[in-house]
Amino acid sequence: MRNLKSVTPLLMAALLWGQSLLAQASLPDFTALVEEASPAVVNISTRQKMPERSVAAQPGLPDLEGLPPMFREFFERSIPQMPRNPGGRQREAQSLGSGFIISADGYVLTNNHVVADADEIIVRLSDRSELEAKLIGADPRSDVALLKVEGKGLPTVRLGKSDELKVGEWVLAIGSPFGFDHSVTAGIVSAKGRNLPSDSYVPFIQTDVAINPGNSGGPLFNLKGEVVGINSQIFTRSGGFMGLSFAIPMEVALQVSEQLKADGKVTRGWLGVVIQEVNKDLAESFGLDRPAGALVAQVLEDGPADKGGLQVGDVILSLNGKPIVMSADLPHLVGGLKPGEKAEMDVVRDGSRKKLKVTIGTLPEEGQELAAAGSTKGGERSSNRLGVTVVELTAEQKKGLDLRGGVVVKEVLSGPAAMIGLRPGDVITHLNNQAIDSTATFAKVAQELPKNRSVSMRVLRQGRASFITFKLAE
């Protein structure tokens, strides 16, 4: 027993030491990666000349021009309405960001929002030398910008394939958060293919790498030391890092940069549809086994989809053999196609599968807005089953809204219509997968709606169409 007691502490110490070594062995060592990659990561500063706000002096407030600089800054921060610069002079706005060199002759990738509207762009290298950069082109839709500095034999990063990234894989960022050059942070890939509301054409890489203002435009590396993304956005309620960072995949950035280098702009494929997500109730309503695909809520007249035979209510399941798992997958795939290219789609229509061929168009510079419905005249019908009163669309409204049919909600009573959020002025174009061309059709379809089953309704509100679902109780 004495021998056992004396051995036990030694065994425990050995076990703890072994666990410590195992933990250390499982954590990556980033030192070699950082030493190799850092020289090609740059700090980007911009200057923009802006007219000073010229505000007339207000009673009880001093003129800032007559104050010492220290007091002037205090009043500017504390009292936004403080009059400043009555002479109308220009002031200089500055911003900081990051970037990385992709070619030895000086091409640099960064974010569009880092250099947007800049009058001067300065790139500072790791040796603290500064070079003036020329903006070759920028693409607001992907938030990618391509710069050029004069130089030869510049250090460059190695480019990797972001589509080979796996969730849970270690990644590392180098950038200039809050101006602190070449700060290194690490984390893991949290998710892939994230769609953000303001960016329909980028399937973002989500990470938990600490990203802060100033990191924008900097590289995201894998453990091989290859750039797999451009750090672009964070989700935050405080203005700082909260564990949700988003990077532009390198494949997207390279496609954009190649077009910017060749043409100074980006041309994307376009289908001419408005789509929405397919949830469980919509899947049941449209005869799908499970939620999948992109539901066509709107088809632009004479657009590529319209000419190819796509209809409102179709569910697009694949494009050129690539599955559409989420509706956000479709814009990414279509945007990557060249205008004039033929594309094959698998769609579900009225519960049956169909194949359609569409000639891809060119994405317009700006979206086309549809006018909202106004007051109406014509026949009036009420549906007690839905709790709604509808009236006919006028010819002028049909033309203005680019519609062939539909009815306008005049009054919403208690019932399913109120529960799903219908409002007066909404235009109902489809009910239970049937086109509504008149108030009589609406009343007939509403009367025949099934009970205890998801029913879809297509609604146009302020120019935007979407499908909503509801169930009628027994």
UniProtKB/Swiss-Prot annotation:
Signal peptide coordinates: 1-25
NCBIfam families assigned to the protein according to its UniProt record, in alphabetical order: degP_htrA_DO (TIGR02037)
Alphabetized UniProt keyword annotations: Hydrolase, Periplasm, Protease, Repeat, Serine protease, Signal, Stress response
Role played: Might be efficient in the degradation of transiently denatured and unfolded proteins which accumulate in the periplasm following stress conditions.
Protein name: Probable periplasmic serine endoprotease DegP-like
Positions of the PDZ domain: 260-351, 357-463
GO annotation (BP), single: proteolysis
SUPFAM superfamilies: PDZ domain-like, Trypsin-like serine proteases
Localisation per UniProt entry: Periplasm
InterPro entries per UniProt: PDZ, PDZ_sf, Pept_S1C_Do, Peptidase_S1_PA, Peptidase_S1C
Residue ranges that the Swiss-Prot or TrEMBL entry lists as coiled coil: none
Source organism, top-level taxon: Bacteria
Keyword field contains 4Fe-4S: no
Cysteine pairs bridged by disulfides in the record: none
Record-listed E.C. numbers: 3.4.21.107
The organism's taxonomic lineage, starting at the top: Bacteria, Pseudomonadati, Pseudomonadota, Gammaproteobacteria, Pseudomonadales
PROSITE patterns noted in UniProt: PDZ
